[in-house]
Amino acid sequence: MNVNEILKVNILDGLDFQGTLGYSTNNAARDEQYLSIDWYQYDGTPIQNENSPYPAKEKSSYTKSSARTDNYTASAFLTYKKLFDEAHDISLMGGVQYDYAAYDYSGTKAMDVEAAIESLNGKGQIYIDKVDRWEEAILSYFGRLNYNYKSRYMVEVNARYDGSSKFLPKNRWNF
């Protein structure tokens, strides 16, 4: 699911505001079966095959897992444009952006399962196979200055200051 909204407002002549909000989510579920196969001779006698690529019944397994990722985005910026004396065209823009992501995963596994039943069943142990969770965020401040003289000479200056949760606190913020 994805949802995005944009708000644009003309505050004054030449001064505009734009804000955006966004959300997206992704869900995934997985069922995995690793089942044993019984091998027989033509006369119906079971074959005990140690070299089989399929597990013995007690080593068969069924794993059920699910994962979810949520992403949030918000940004806002102001833009100012003005032409002075029909020669000096100036544009200023400044803003902020925030991105946040969260991930959740869990998996459960059952051993020694019955092949005919597709659920977490079994005579053996049922246990948590894996649990994982993480979050990350980025906050950014940015700006731009454009100057244009009679559409002949142009200068542009950009700056951006970012902070990320992926880095250690002493390295978290940088240009």
Regions found by a protein language model. Give the residues of each.
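Transmembrane beta-strands of outer-membrane beta-barrel pores
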Residues: Y23-A29, K82, V96-D104, A159-S165
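Substrate-binding groove/exosite segments of carbohydrate-active enzymes
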Residues: L12, A29-R30
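A general, composition-driven signal for non-globular sequence regions
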Residues: T20, S24-N26, T69, S75
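Ordered, soluble secondary-structure elements with a strong preference for glycine-centered loop motifs
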Residues: R68, P169-K170
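Feature captures outer-membrane beta-barrel proteins of Gram-negative bacteria and organelles
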Residues: N174-F175
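Secondary-structure transition into beta-strands, especially the periplasmic turns and strand N-termini
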Residues: E5-Y23, Y80-G94, Y147-V155, K166-P169
